[in-house]
UniProtKB/Swiss-Prot annotation:
GO function terms (MF aspect): structural constituent of ribosome
Chain positions covered by the region annotation Disordered: 1-25
A single Gene Ontology CC term: large ribosomal subunit
Compartments where located: Plastid, Chloroplast
Name under which the protein is recorded: Large ribosomal subunit protein bL32c
Family recorded in the similarity comment: Belongs to the bacterial ribosomal protein bL32 family.
The keyword Transmembrane helix is annotated on this UniProt entry: no
Keywords noted in UniProt: Chloroplast, Plastid, Ribonucleoprotein, Ribosomal protein
Organism domain of life: Eukaryota
Biological process per Gene Ontology, one example term: translation
Comp. bias (Basic residues): 1-19
Length: 58
């Protein structure tokens, strides 16, 4: 005869969900920080190239 599964408590479910969300939030913050670093380095390299090109043309 089929027996229903034992239910997990809401507290355990909420704790697991909160843990997952906090880890995801940390990873998202890391990814954003890395993206900002890459963009800053690209902008710095681009501005350096523009300055050297303007000096060479003068």
């Amino acid at each position: 005869m089929a027996v229903p599964k034992k239910r997990k408590s809401k507290m355990k479910t909420r704790l697991r969900k909160a843990q997952w969300k906090s880890e995801a939030s940390r990873e998202a913050a890391k990814a954003l920080s890395k993206a900002k670093t890459v963009i800053k380095s690209l902008l710095a390299a681009n501005s350096a190239n523009l300055e050297s090109n303007s000096e060479n043309s003068n």
